[in-house]
Amino acid sequence: MKKYLFLFVAVVSLALSSGQAYAQRYLPKMMGVELRGGFVNGSKSPLNYNTGIAMSGYTKKANRWVVGAEYLLKNYDYRSTSIPRAQFTAEGGYYLKFLSDPTKTFFLSIGGSALAGYETVNWGDRLLHDGSTLLAKDAFIYGGAITLELESYITDRIVLLANVRERVLWGGSLGKFSTQFGLGVKFIIN
């Protein structure tokens, strides 16, 4: 028993004293699955939010590509109720890493994405509760997004994300621009 206890203490001591070894991060062909969420247009209301899932892959120069899907819900006040606008979009983009710390724990990236999807206003019901008719229609939407994202490695396989994103989408009846503030988590899968 003393032999195993000594071996355990020796291994833990070596592991804690070797503070100079850093994990290999942002290597080519690494893949990750991202879960994202956040607020829309600076609103802290739980009624205006976005959520999504994405797959990211790293390239040779520590940049990455991203492919994903996102759901965005924004409510517009109308008298004593609110009118929801929901967007379902697919994304394909590329992010450039432009800043990182020496320990490779924090990475700051800027990226551009192409977006396409569908927008529905009031879930397709154009007649409101008071008899008014909505002029906004459901439509296919397309456009792009610019994203500033901070990645913070918690472990070698778990990454916390914080981002600010500006989306511009044409084809819909309502505003074209949406600002998003979000958080997420990425799981490195290989």
Q: PLM ranges: what are they?
A:
Residues 1-28, 190:
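Cleavable N-terminal export/targeting peptides
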Residues 3, 25-29, 61-63, 100-106, ...:
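Short coil turns and loop connectors of transmembrane beta-barrels in diderm outer membranes
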Residues 29-31, 45-51, 82-90, 106, ...:
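Residues that define the transmembrane beta-barrel architecture of outer-membrane proteins
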Residues 38-41, 76-83, 130-136, 168-172:
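Extracellular loop and loop/strand-boundary signature of outer-membrane beta-barrel proteins
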Residues 54-129, 187-190:
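Gram-negative (and chloroplast) outer-membrane scaffold detector with strong preference
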Residues 72-74, 149-190:
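Predominantly the C-terminal beta-signal and adjacent terminal strand-loop region
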